[in-house]
Regions:
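Solvent-exposed soluble domains appended to multi-pass membrane proteins
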Residues: 1-181
């Protein structure tokens, strides 16, 4: 299995939007569709591999393009009016795990738009699309501990001594890191 063509992102693509390590996934996929269409017209059978960068550590710049909220939503009883109020605590804002979740949301949107664009171009007929990750997100167990044990009422993280504490042991931590499945 060899490659007949290789498209270099900084030579064959217009770097019109960068996020993190390079060209944004949305721009990359948008620009890839005409290239795929050309290859599809020239070849009866072909294989292509596309590498996404936006959902790659260190997840920098993602706040600029993702509106995904990494907050803890909860209801608090208001004794004055007897109603429950919707509250929000931005407990993962500014954390690596929060940025990772935002980048996953962005990647999901980019892949969804890519699939729509491929379908609109008639490129999904007789096609198999495989999506996989090549490694985990490199998130420390302490970040997951905050995720599973955040207390919005005290704006703190539960400890092992607190009721309701969820231990993020080695098994559970590694289970969340297993890639691709």
């Amino acid at each position: 299995l060899g490659y007949d063509d290789f498209f270099n992102y900084n030579k064959d693509f217009n770097i019109d939007e960068t996020i993190g390590l390079g060209l944004s996934d949305k721009s990359f996929f948008r620009q890839a569709v005409p290239k795929i269409d050309k290859i599809n017209k020239e070849h009866d059978k072909w294989y292509g591999a596309f590498l996404m960068l936006t959902n790659h550590t260190p997840f920098t710049d993602i706040e600029r393009v993702s509106d995904y909220e990494v907050d803890f939503k909860y209801k608090m009883y208001n004794e004055e009016d007897g109603m429950y109020e919707e509250k929000s605590a931005p407990f993962l804002e500014g954390t690596k795990l929060g940025s990772y979740f935002k980048s996953v949301h962005y990647a999901d949107q980019a892949i969804g738009q890519f699939m729509t664009d491929l379908d609109n171009a008639g490129l999904l007929d007789n096609t198999v699309v495989v999506i996989y990750g090549d490694h985990d997100a490199k998130i420390k167990a302490e970040e997951y501990d905050r995720y599973f044990n955040y207390n919005p009422f005290t704006d703190s993280v539960l400890t092992e001594d607190d009721e309701g504490y969820v231990p993020v042991d080695d098994f559970y931590y590694n289970l969340n890191r297993k890639v691709p499945f």
